[in-house]
Amino acid sequence: VLQACPDTIFLGHAPGFWIHISGDDLSLKDTYPEANAPVLPGGRIPELLRKYPNLYCDISAGSGRLALSRDLDFTRKFLIEFHDRILYARDYFDNKHQELLNSLSLPVPVLEDIYFRNAERLLAE
C-alpha cells in the first residue's frame, strides 16, 4: 500500500505496528517485548521509513513508548534519523512520553519536529 499510494500519508500506530521496530522473531508479537529488550537489526519500521517517505510514526499509544523505551541508544539514533516523520500525540493524561523524549538529550530541532512541526506540516497540506 505504501508503494501503491505514494501520495497518501500513512501513520503507523499501536502494538501491531510498533512490534516491528526490531528484528525480533515475529512469534513475539503475542507477547510484546518488555522495556530493556535490545532492538535487533532487521526491524521493518526502519526499513520501511527509509524506503517510503509517505510513512509516519505516531507515538501516542503506550506501545509507541514501550517500543522506544526498549533500547535507548537505538531510540536516540532512530528519532534523529526519522525526526521529520515522528508524530507526538497522547491518548492518556500522563507525562511518560515527554519524560522519555526529554531524557534522550535530543537536539532541540529534533524535539520540535516531533512535538509539533511535523503535525503542523501535515495539517497544512
Residue map of PLM features:
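Catalytic pocket-lining loop regions of alpha/beta-barrel enzymes
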Residues: V1-L87
